[in-house]
Regions:
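Active-site-surrounding "flap" and adjacent substrate/cofactor-binding loops of secreted or lumenal enzymes
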Residues: 2-11
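Glycine-rich anion/phosphate-binding loop at the beta-strand->alpha-helix junction
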Residues: 70-79, 224, 228-327, 333-334
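Conserved structured core elements
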Residues: 44, 71-74, 125, 136, ...
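Short beta-alpha connecting loops at secondary-structure transitions
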Residues: 130, 166-170, 209, 250-251, ...
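Accessory "access/gating" subregions that flank catalytic or transport cores
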Residues: 154-275
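Active-site cavity-forming subdomains of large catalytic enzyme subunits
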Residues: 12-20, 24-171
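Conserved small/polar residues in nucleotide/adenosyl-binding loops
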Residues: 367-369
Length: 369
């Protein structure tokens, strides 16, 4: 209907940088998943066209700014939906092109939206959820690398292995803590450096407390996985349709608070992996434990690894700023009807930056070992 088409066009008011292609693919996938449950009131042809987009890598151009994270991700999902109507732009075969031309090239007719379909496409948390899923996958990888780099740093710093023994962690049985301690022991098994007698009694916290800090981040990742698994297997549309009960309910499943909180939490957990890693880097270049200052033979003549630590510190500081929770803010909109919003989209895009930052900090730590 004309109303549904107008809804899509009027809500396509996003701005800022483009959403990365891998995130757009996830948005499409998650929207297809949500609509497939049959509580959204859409025609089969609309869902099939979204599947066509996904399978043929026809990726709508979507922008990062514009969603309040309640009433769903209205602006980003409007941009996702425009190409269904032959409007907007898509990325296809590596180039951004008008959607109408790509649809014509592929022999696809624009979809004529029926009653409720515009709302079904615009309402939903798929923008936030796509960022969350991407970040979760990256978090697992970065958590594993943080343990490996932490173990190598401990070895290089002539650290003690005793704080990583099972006995210590079984009396404070956080799952992530125990897992991390065992990872470190396994990674350093057979090392002559870690096994040799030590002069010092204790290591700095950034080494000694690897299980407690890395472990807490692991437990956070597990929690966020549970939240996102529930979210992406849900209907987050409004109003929701129950055909068997002959019932349509206007409710609030579009509100992004569950994942907004989770993504803020995950950003903090990942930033801490970067923060503690940078501190170990600093210790390695400090001239302690018979290591040369800045890890260079002639520190007066050469700067060695002095400036890479500056870079890591700068990135860590930026991540700390990005960890200000987005979900604590709410600005009323729609003449006060939408008087509490999650700001989950801001949590999502900040989380993306924290993930990238943490990867860079870990890479910088690795080159110091």
């Amino acid at each position: 209907s004309r109303l549904q088409q107008n809804l899509v066009m009027s809500h396509a008011c996003g701005t800022g940088e483009r959403v990365p292609s891998e995130i757009v693919r996830l948005i499409l996938l998650l929207k297809i998943q949500s609509l497939s449950y049959g509580h959204s009131g859409v025609q089969l042809a609309t869902v099939e066209r979204l599947i066509d987009f996904f399978n043929n890598d026809v990726l709508p151009v979507v922008y990062q700014q514009g969603s309040l994270g309640a009433s769903g991700d209205l602006a980003p999902l409007a941009h996702m939906s425009l190409p269904l109507l032959g409007l907007g732009e898509v990325e296809y075969k590596g180039a951004v092109r008008p959607a109408a031309g790509v649809l014509s090239e592929l022999g696809w007719q624009p979809i004529e939206l029926q009653s409720k379909e515009g709302l079904a496409l615009l309402n939903g948390t798929q923008f936030m959820s796509a960022y969350g899923v991407w970040a979760l996958i990256q978090s697992r990888r970065l958590s594993e690398w943080a343990d490996r780099i932490g173990a190598l740093s401990l070895d290089a710093f002539d650290g003690r292995i005793e704080p990583f023994c099972d006995e210590v962690h079984l009396i404070r049985a956080h799952k992530g803590q125990l897992t991390t301690a065992r990872n470190i022991c396994r990674l350093l098994e057979g090392s002559e450096l870690i096994a040799r007698p030590k002069k010092h009694v204790q290591d700095p916290y950034s080494f000694r407390c690897i299980p407690q800090v890395h472990g807490a981040s692991k437990d956070t990742i597990d929690y966020v996985e549970g939240v996102l698994t529930t979210e992406i297997n849900s209907t987050t549309d409004n109003p929701t349709v129950f055909p068997e009960e002959d019932m349509v309910v206007s409710a609030g499943n579009f509100h992004g608070q569950p994942i907004a909180l989770a993504m803020d939490f995950l950003a903090i957990a990942l930033a801490e992996l970067g923060s503690i890693s940078e501190r170990r880097t600093y210790k390695l270049i400090s001239g302690a434990r018979e290591l040369p200052a800045f890890l260079v033979a002639k520190p007066g003549l050469n700067s060695g690894f002095m400036i890479p630590q500056y870079t890591a510190a700068s990135i860590v500081s930026q991540s700390k700023g990005l960890c200000m929770p987005a979900s604590v803010d709410s600005i009323p909109s729609s003449q006060g009807q939408e008087d509490h919003v999650s700001m989950g989209s801001n949590a999502a895009t900040k989380l993306y930056r924290v993930v990238c930052n943490t990867e860079r900090v870990l890479a910088l730590s690795l080159i110091h070992i």
